[in-house]
């Protein structure tokens, strides 16, 4: 289906467009991205679509169409209200933490969190610190979580003005689930996560990007927008799915080369 949609230049190629919006456009014979580029924003038939959303969709359609014609990716930073987009970012702090969790969904009801990765300033240098499960069992997951919480507690005791940055809601949700899961045996976990949530220390960069960045791409995944700020990854693992497959192979073979 995706190949057909791309070939037909169907309007679902625009990032974050909703089904209800697509249905409204189709009633007006707006079927392709190119059609959307030329819509009249004052058309009363589009009044059920928020005017700002309609304008943004037209702008994104122009970027998508331009890439289709030139092969070049592009983006613009849009104006937003004071409480949205880039305005949601706090003042940078040298002790800010950037966190990424990797989970294995095919284990139990809630899956298995096998990797907590942190990128942060330790006071002497910027480094990547990780907590990795050596086997697929809850004991390793528990130890990982305890080690992570103890590390974060020390960090925020030392740097109370720091924030935790993540991309999309997975990390915040997974940490909350883990803290609740182990609250009876490790209350420090739920206490710290609740405290960080109350203090609004978790900054979701996906929401920032979603509200202020309009691109020529079909989605706003981290892998997709990386092309705008870094060179292409040289590592074999490029997506969360790649990581899951590799962890699955590692569990099956216990091959340390992985």
Regions found by a protein language model. Name each.
Residues 28-109:
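Long, highly charged low-complexity segments
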Residues 1-24, 38, 43-58:
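Long, low-complexity intrinsically disordered regions
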Residues 1-8, 13, 19, 28-29, ...:
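Acidic, Mg2+-coordinating catalytic module of metal-dependent nucleases/exonucleases
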Residues 14, 23-25, 34-35, 106-109, ...:
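Short helix/loop capping segments that flank catalytic or ligand/cofactor-binding pockets
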Residues 91-147:
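Metal-dependent catalytic core segments for phosphate chemistry
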Residues 120, 128-244:
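Conserved DEDDh/DEDDy metal-dependent 3′-5′ exonuclease domain
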Residues 12, 83-88, 102-106, 150-155, ...:
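Generic recognition of flexible, low-complexity loop/linker segments
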């Amino acid at each position: 289906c995706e190949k057909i949609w791309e070939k037909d230049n169907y309007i679902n190629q625009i990032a974050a467009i909703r089904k209800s919006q697509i249905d409204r456009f189709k009633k007006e014979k707006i079927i392709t991205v190119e059609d959307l580029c030329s819509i009249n924003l004052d058309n009363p038939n589009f009044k059920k679509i928020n005017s700002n959303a309609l304008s943004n969709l037209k702008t994104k359609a122009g970027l998508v169409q331009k890439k289709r014609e030139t092969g070049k990716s592009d983006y613009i930073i849009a104006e937003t209200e004071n409480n949205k987009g880039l305005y949601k970012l706090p003042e940078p702090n040298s002790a800010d933490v950037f966190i990424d969790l990797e989970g294995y969904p095919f284990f139990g009801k809630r899956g298995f969190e096998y990797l907590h990765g942190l990128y942060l300033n330790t006071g002497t240098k910027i480094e990547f610190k990780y907590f990795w499960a050596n086997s697929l069992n809850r004991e390793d997951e528990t130890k990982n979580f305890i080690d992570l919480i103890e590390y974060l507690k020390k960090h925020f005791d030392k740097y109370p003005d720091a924030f935790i940055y993540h991309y999309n809601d997975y990390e915040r949700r997974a940490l909350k689930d883990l803290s609740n899961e182990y609250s009876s045996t490790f209350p420090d976990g739920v206490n710290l996560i609740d405290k960080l949530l109350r203090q609004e220390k978790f900054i979701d960069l996906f929401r920032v990007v979603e509200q202020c960045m309009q691109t020529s791409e079909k989605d706003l995944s981290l892998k997709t927008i990386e092309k705008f700020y870094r060179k292409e990854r040289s590592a074999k693992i490029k997506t969360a799915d790649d990581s899951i497959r590799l962890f699955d192979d590692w569990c099956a073979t216990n091959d340390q080369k992985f």
